[in-house]
Amino acid sequence: MAEKRNIFLVGPMGAGKSTIGRHLAQQLHMEFIDSDTVIEERTGADIAWVFDVEGEEGFRKREEAVINDLTEQQGIVLATGGGSVISKENRNRLSARGIVVYLETTIEKQLARTNRDKKRPLLQTDCPREVLEQLAEDRNPLYEEIADITVRTDDQSAKVVANQIVKMLEEHIM
């Protein structure tokens, strides 16, 4: 790939966006950025704190500003937050400014990958499965709407998924 286009990873929490993104960036010799990490750096607090103090709406405003800034860069692999696609502005920017890769996974895999993670405000509930099912119902069509490439991440290592994405990117660009 001569041209270093942006690659934006979307998908639900626990799909592997950050882990796969790091492998992908390394393979493609691109910079890896996690939008949630940038939000935390700019805020000086973790995502859970932002949710507690500003609510989801306050967090989404911050996320929209960060995604706008990051998608204007060139040659990056960006792992977005699971809810970033809620914003039509974000969906438009992601679609227009790079190749969108949707990382699909099952609710079971999400539960297994997130069950000990206390940094996921939406899962701090007695019924995380119900939350994930509702999020999937609401968000999966939005991921599909903007995806240029879709990859299932369930039973493969992050490195294998990254390899698959590289092959698909080569086919997509040609």
Curated annotation (Swiss-Prot):
The keyword RNA-binding does not apply. This is Shikimate kinase. It catalyses: shikimate + ATP = 3-phosphoshikimate + ADP + H(+). NCBIfam families: PRK05057.1. Monomer. Pathway: Metabolic intermediate biosynthesis; chorismate biosynthesis; chorismate from D-erythrose 4-phosphate and phosphoenolpyruvate: step 5/7. Keywords: Amino-acid biosynthesis, Aromatic amino acid biosynthesis, ATP-binding, Cytoplasm, Kinase, Magnesium, Metal-binding, Nucleotide-binding, Transferase. Mg(2+) binds at S18. It comes from Vibrio cholerae serotype O1 (strain ATCC 39315 / El Tor Inaba N16961). The keyword Zinc-finger does not apply. SUPFAM superfamilies: P-loop containing nucleoside triphosphate hydrolases. InterPro entries: P-loop_NTPase, Shikimate/glucono_kinase, Shikimate_kinase/TSH1, Shikimate_kinase_CS. It is an enzyme of class 2 (transferase). Binds 1 Mg(2+) ion per subunit. Its cofactor is Mg(2+). Gene3D superfamilies: P-loop containing nucleotide triphosphate hydrolases. Its EC number is 2.7.1.71. CDD domains: SK. GO terms for biological process: amino acid biosynthetic process; aromatic amino acid family biosynthetic process; chorismate biosynthetic process. Belongs to the shikimate kinase family. It is found in: Cytoplasm. Catalyzes the specific phosphorylation of the 3-hydroxyl group of shikimic acid using ATP as a cosubstrate. It holds the Pfam family SKI. GO terms for molecular function: ATP binding; magnesium ion binding; shikimate kinase activity. PROSITE patterns: SHIKIMATE_KINASE.
